[in-house]
Curated annotation (Swiss-Prot):
Keyword Ribonucleoprotein: no
Keyword set, alphabetical order: Cytoplasm, NAD, Oxidoreductase, Pyridoxine biosynthesis
Annotated EC: 1.2.1.72
Gene3D superfamilies (alphabetical): Dihydrodipicolinate Reductase, domain 2, NAD(P)-binding Rossmann-like Domain
UniProt record similarity statement: Belongs to the glyceraldehyde-3-phosphate dehydrogenase family. Epd subfamily.
Keyword presence, Oxidoreductase: yes
Protein name per UniProt: D-erythrose-4-phosphate dehydrogenase
Residue positions of the active site: 154
Superkingdom field: Bacteria
Species per Swiss-Prot/TrEMBL record: Pseudoalteromonas atlantica (strain T6c / ATCC BAA-1087)
GO BP term (any one): pyridoxine biosynthetic process
Site (Activates thiol group during catalysis): 181
Pathway(s) per entry: Cofactor biosynthesis; pyridoxine 5'-phosphate biosynthesis; pyridoxine 5'-phosphate from D-erythrose 4-phosphate: step 1/5
Functional summary from the UniProt entry: Catalyzes the NAD-dependent conversion of D-erythrose 4-phosphate to 4-phosphoerythronate.
Length: 342
């Protein structure tokens, strides 16, 4: 049993726990502790009831300072400082760092200093972490000695597998991406102050451009594309599921059928469970609670002058990414058991 602690029980933290129980992987991964500054009553309530993902179908109760999920007791902590977390006492194998604010190697080192064996960040980190892992792309590069790891971002997990498939099949020269992302917690319900002036505006009333470092994230995982991709992002008034508008220039000449066939082929092969492909006339809500990292909408594939390709790629930016966090924990544990690091 892998002993895991979650630091920060927000959208990703809660969905990781939900996914563990819904998929039965709680038999392999035990959530031992949750560190969340919110009151325990709120922690339990938001685990049980979720606007995007519905009611949690497993029983949840509070027992003093413990959250009891389907009979499993989870210690609740409310520590602001990583240095106050009792990871050694709790014998934690992996900390899932899901606060959204701790994204530097030093934060991972603090968790390890407290007794955790490994740390997995739920967001992009700097190049000084031991590894950034995108499932289906580079998990085989992970070593047992890698103790501070990033799972990248939901958008990196969505777009990188598609780029990789296109590059292997047709050789990608360059590209641009527009992320069409659901609203997030750092936006305002009504107009209110924020350092980013665009994010001072009501999330439900506008399409809001925001900064993104997606292009740099692609380079970190696929270094051959350094300087060859650019990206912009907008937030739209939905609460979950996002889309990626990908345009790439290929070295090969292709048709729409060529592109779609290449993507169809891998969905049942090495990217099974990571990349999916659909030609049904679906809308964003149809992908809610979809565990794939990316779903290519083949009805929207376009080709111009045989070498410029445009794709629409969907993802449940919460559920898909949370499932990839679990996948990486399992890979980390397998490596630790095999002690294959160098």
């Amino acid at each position: 049993m892998i002993r895991v602690a979650i630091n920060g029980f927000g959208r990703v933290g809660r969905n990781v726990l939900r996914a563990l129980y819904e998929t039965g992987q709680n038999k392999q991964i035990q959530i031992v502790a949750i560190n969340e500054l919110a009151e325990p009553e709120g922690v339990a309530h938001l685990l049980k009831y979720d606007t995007a993902h519905g009611r949690f179908r497993f029983p949840v109760v509070l027992d003093n300072q413990q959250l009891v999920v389907a009979g499993d007791h989870i210690t609740l902590l409310q520590q602001e400082n990583i240095r106050d977390l009792p990871w050694a006492q709790l014998d934690i194998d992996v900390v899932l760092e899901c606060t959204g604010v701790n994204n530097e190697r030093v934060h991972g080192e603090q968790h390890i200093a407290q007794g955790a064996k490994k740390v997995l960040f739920s967001q992009p980190c700097g190049p000084d972490v031991d590894a950034t892992i995108i499932m289906g792309i580079n998990e085989e590069s992970l070593k047992a000695s890698d103790s501070i790891v990033s799972a990248g971002s939901c958008t990196t997990n969505c777009i990188v597998p598609v780029i990789q498939v296109l590059d292997e099949a047709f050789s990608v020269s360059s590209g641009t991406i527009t992320t069409i992302h659901s609203s997030m917690h750092d936006q305002q319900v009504i107009d209110a102050y924020h350092p980013d002036l665009r994010r001072t505006r009501a999330a439900s009333q506008s399409i809001i451009p925001v900064d993104t470092k997606l292009a740099r994230g692609i380079e970190r995982v696929l270094p051959k594309f350094a300087g060859k991709f650019e990206a912009i992002a907008v937030r739209v008034p939905t609460i979950n599921v996002s889309a990626m508008d990908l345009s790439v220039t290929l070295d090969a000449k292709v048709t729409i059928d060529d592109v779609n066939q290449a993507l169809k082929t891998v969905k049942n092969g090495r990217l099974n469970g990571i990349l999916d492909f659909t030609e049904e006339p679906l809308v964003s809500v149809d992908f809610n609670h979809d565990a794939h990292s990316c779903i290519v909408d083949g009805t929207q594939t376009r080709v111009s002058h045989k070498q410029l390709v445009k794709l629409l790629v969907w993802c449940d930016n919460e559920w898909g990414f949370s499932n990839r966090m679990i996948d990486i924990v399992l890979v980390m544990n397998t490596l630790s058991l095999g002690n294959t690091g160098k």
